[in-house]
């Protein structure tokens, strides 16, 4: 997900193609970083009513954040061709780094309470909606994020 915008910006696109790209990217993000984590947490947390409510609210927070971002991004693109330098609120993609860490801790029985998953969703979902500007990572930070993701994958393979 880190590279799709960079790839898209190398292509000459009409206004409608740009708008379509924003929408389809957000739909993909909603499924990958909203619905999938929500269903995962619901399943691993014992399919309780509380985890169903929390997971549903998490998906709703991701949806609201992405829809609001789309409105802001369309407006921004109509005013400038510059690349965005900040995010408004925590990006939905951050769950892809946080959820595996929590799962690894849970799997290694370092912390056995399965409610840690719904708590993560509450914190993360709240972060999606906070009107806080977060600076976009540069190349070095992106490399660190990729390295951390690779480390997570190998850790999950080795320890599970």
Where do the model's predicted regions map?
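Alpha-helical transmembrane segments and their membrane-interface exit regions
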Residues: 1-2, 59-66, 121-130
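Multi-pass membrane catalytic core of lipid/isoprenoid biosynthesis enzymes
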Residues: 10-65
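Cytosolic, membrane-interface loops and tails of multi-pass inner-membrane proteins
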Residues: 3-18, 68-85
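Conformational gate/switch positions in structured elements
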Residues: 2, 26, 30, 90-92, ...
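Perimembrane helix-loop junctions in membrane proteins
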Residues: 5, 43-46, 69-76, 106-107, ...
């Amino acid at each position: 997900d880190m590279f799709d915008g960079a790839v898209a910006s190398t292509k000459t696109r009409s206004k409608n193609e740009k708008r379509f790209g924003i929408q389809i990217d957000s739909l993909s993000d909603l499924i990958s970083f909203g619905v999938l984590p929500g269903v995962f947490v619901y399943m691993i947390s014992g399919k309780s009513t509380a985890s169903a409510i929390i997971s549903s609210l998490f998906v709703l927070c991701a949806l609201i954040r992405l829809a609001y971002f789309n409105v802001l991004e369309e407006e921004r693109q109509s005013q400038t061709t510059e690349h965005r330098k900040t995010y408004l609120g925590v990006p939905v993609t951050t769950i892809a780094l946080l959820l595996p860490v929590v799962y690894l801790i849970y799997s290694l029985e370092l912390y056995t309470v399965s409610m840690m998953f719904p708590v993560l969703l509450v914190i993360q979902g709240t972060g999606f909606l906070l009107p806080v500007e977060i600076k976009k990572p540069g190349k070095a930070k992106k490399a660190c994020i990729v390295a951390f993701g690779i480390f997570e994958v190998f850790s999950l393979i080795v320890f599970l």
